[in-house]
Each structure stands twice: as C-alpha cells, then as structure tokens.
Amino acid sequence: MTELLWAVVALLAGLAGGAGIGVYWANNGVSSLVQRKAAEARLLIEEARSQQKEILLQAKDEALRIRNEAEAELRESRQSLQKQEERLQRKEENIDRKLEGIERRERLIQQRERQIEQLTQEAERLKRQQAQELERISQLSREEARSIILAEVERETREDAARRIRELEQQTKEEADKIARKIIGLAIQRCASDYVAEMTVSTVNLPSEELKGRIIGREGRNIRAFEQITGVDIIVDDTPEAVTLSCHDPVRREVARVALLKLLKDGRIHPSRIEEVVHKTQLEIEQIMREEGERVAYEANVQGLHPDLIKLLGRLKYRTSYGQNVLQHSLECALLAAHMAAELGANVNIAKTAALLHDIGKAVDHEVQGPHALIGAEIARRLGRSAAIVHAIAAHHYDEEPQTVEAFLVIAADAISGARPGARRETLDLYIKRLEALETVATSFPGVQRAFAVQAGREVRVMVQPDQIDDLASIHLARNVAKKIEESLQYPGQIKVTIIRETRAVDYAR
C-alpha cells in the first residue's frame, strides 16, 4: 500500500513537472512569435513611411514642373500679346502718318490751285499792260499786237499746263499704286493659300527587277499591248527597279501610271487583263476629274458651270506650269480675283468665274492648236458663259486687249499667284540661262553700258550712257527692251524693265 502510494505521488510529481516544463516552453514560443511580428510590423511601417516620402517628393517635383510649364506658357502668351500690341501700334502709327501725308498733299494742292488762280489773274493783267505798251511803242494796230501777245501767252500757258499735268500724273500714279498695293495685300491676306509647288511624276517604282520582264512579256506582247491601249510609251532602261512613262497627254499618263500599279499589285499581266484594267482605270480617273472639278468650283463658290466645264476643270489636276499645279493655281486666282473685285466694287461673280476658268484651255491645248487663252475663251463661249467672262479669259495673256475691270483683275490674280514665292520653280540651269538671256537682250541695244537681271529674273535694270541716251530716249529704250524680251524669251509672270540714266557734274573750289 505504501509503495502504491509512493508510486502515485511520483506519477503526479512527474506530471506536474512535465506540465510546468510545457508551459515554460509554450510561453517562450509565444513571446518570440510576438517579437517577430512586431519587428515585421515596424519594418512595414518604415517602408510605408519611406514610400510616403518618395510619393510626396514626386508629387512636389511634378507640381513644380507643372507650375514652371504654366509660368513659361504664361510668359510666352504675354510676350505674344505684347508683340501683337506693338504691331498694332506700329500699324496705327503708319496709318496716322499716311493720313497726315494725304492731308498735307490736299492742303498743298489747294495752295497750288490758289497760286495758279493768282498767276492766271496776274497773267491777264500783264497781258493787258503788254498790249498797251506794245501799241504805244510800236504803233501797231490793236489786232496785230493782240496776235503777238496771244502767241506768247499761248506758249507760256502750254508750258505751265504741261508742267502741271506732269505733277498731277505723278501724284495720281502714286495714289493709284498705294491703293493697288492695299487691295492686293488685303486679297492675299484673305486668300491665305498654303499650297506649294509640285511636279508630275512619271516614274513607276517596281518591287523587284524581275517585274520588268513580266511587263515586257513574251516577245514584247505585254508592253506593246499596254502602249497601244493607253497611248503611253513605257521606257524600260537600266534604272534599277523603275520604269518611266512618257506621254504628252498628262491624263493618259496618269491612267497608265495607275493601271500599271494595279497590274503589278494583281500579278496577272497579259493583254486581255491589261485592257480590262486600263478601261476601269479610265473610268476612275474620269470620276476623279469630275469630283476635283466640282470640289474646286464649290471652294471658289462658282455655281452653274456646264458639266463639260467641270470635267475640263478637273483635268487641270494633272497639269503643271513651271511646277505649279494648274488646278490649284486656278482656284487661287479665283479667290484673289473675287477679293480684289469686292474691294474695287467690280462684278465679283464675273471676276472669280473668269479667273477660275482662265487656264481651261490648257486642258486641251495639246489637242487643239493655238494659245491656251483663246482656246479656253472659245470653250467657255460654246458652253454658255457670258461675253464678259469669255473676254476676261481671252485677254489674260493679252491675246486680246483687256477692256473691262474684271479682265484686268484676272490678269493681276494670275500674275500674283504665279509670282508668289514657292509657287513655281525651274531647274538651276534653266534659271541661270534665263538670267543670262535677259542681260544679253538688254545689252544688245546701242547706248547700254551694263544690264543686271535681279529679283530672281523678274526685273532687268539697264545702265545707259548719259551722253548717248537722253530722258526721252530712255522711255523708248525701255519699251524696246520689253518688246524684244516678249518676242525672244519664254518666262512665267511678267518682267519689269528699268532704265537707269545717271549724270554727274563735278567741279572743284580752289
């Protein structure tokens, strides 16, 4: 019994000890877990704070950048506004100066008119006095003395009138030039064309050199069929991966170019397929021309054009003059002529319609003989345009003498559009040869010392020998030089001929 009791006590003691040890280790494990979690929490908090600082820094940098950009834009806007204000102020000052100049000239004219009136009265008084004196001295009859006096007065009056006419002509010319520059400037500003010159491309690039053989075909049947159907010559030479299309008709050349590209893309190249593709392409190009003609007529606000005129107008899309697209040139002329007609109080509809159609003859000038201005005028007449429009078209290159304001406006619009920088271009060799030819023509006249082609060939300045060419001969020389340039040279726009005659008188004070 005692042994059993001790055994039970020992068992209980062991259990108690094991339980204590278990509790001890459990407490230690929980404590270490808590410490690890706390460390992890602190680490997360530090990372969050670090990220918060980075985000705040980035936000501050972005805010600073946005603020700097806004300040820069604000400065630019202020500078732009300041420049605009300065330009407006300068324009206002120029206008004020011009108005003051006009008022001064008006006062001067009135003063000169009063002086002329006084001089006329004085001349009458002197005439009477001279008549009395002559009659007294020479014992001439009154009629004889009257004839002598009238002859003298007539001579003096003619001189005064000629001098006055020259002054008025010069003043009128200055005023007219000033008004013309203003009207042209307003028209150009309102037109604001952004078109640049272009060249017609007649070269078709090939994906590979092997396609040249397929274009030629067996024994040349493909190329012969293509040339026969389109009327365009295909030049296959040593140019790598390219063939050239040659034809005087730009529409046929465009049809051939588009059809050849379609055949190359399709891959089937044989005579029957060529005929089918060319026929479809012709219909497409005709549709494109009609659409282009309608578009340009709509943009120019010209209504009621005959469908054939619309089609011919669209054909100008494929014509160029010195690199300038003729269709776009016609639209630009129409807008310029309309604005100038509105400023002058002329018929806007006649001016813009004639300007839009002024080069319509170029659409068929390779088919019809004659100047394109007269060809276009005849087409416009047959298709129902008014006589005023027909005359303006025919006169825009002086094939007819211009008789109406609208005709002169078409001439001016054509010259402005062609002379605009960047509108037309020539090769360097042709440009240099044209300048040399201008100088050669001018120096071929006797009495000419030197000649200079300036303003990109738009003006020729001729220096003459003052002892051989007087003022009257200078006028004839300018006319003769201009006439010879017209007869012997080809050039876009117009060329101004300026004769410069300089005389010097030198003496020495000793």
From Swiss-Prot:
Keyword Metal-binding among record annotations: no
Classification via InterPro entries: HD/PDEase_dom, HD_domain, HDIG_dom, KH_dom, KH_dom_type_1, KH_dom_type_1_sf, Ribonuclease_Y, RNase_Y_N
Domain KH, residue spans: 200-260
One cellular component (GO) term of this entry: plasma membrane
Domain HD span(s) in chain numbering: 326-419
Membrane topology: Single-pass membrane protein
GO biological process terms, semicolon-separated: mRNA catabolic process
Protein EC: 3.1.-.-
Keywords, alphabetical: Cell membrane, Endonuclease, Hydrolase, Membrane, Nuclease, RNA-binding, Transmembrane, Transmembrane helix
Residue ranges crossing the lipid bilayer per the database entry: 4-24
Keyword match Zinc-finger: no
Cell location: Cell membrane
Similarity section: Belongs to the RNase Y family.
Role according to the record: Endoribonuclease that initiates mRNA decay.
Protein name, UniProt field: Ribonuclease Y
Source species: Chloroflexus aurantiacus (strain ATCC 29366 / DSM 635 / J-10-fl)
Organism placement in taxonomy: Bacteria, Bacillati, Chloroflexota, Chloroflexia, Chloroflexales
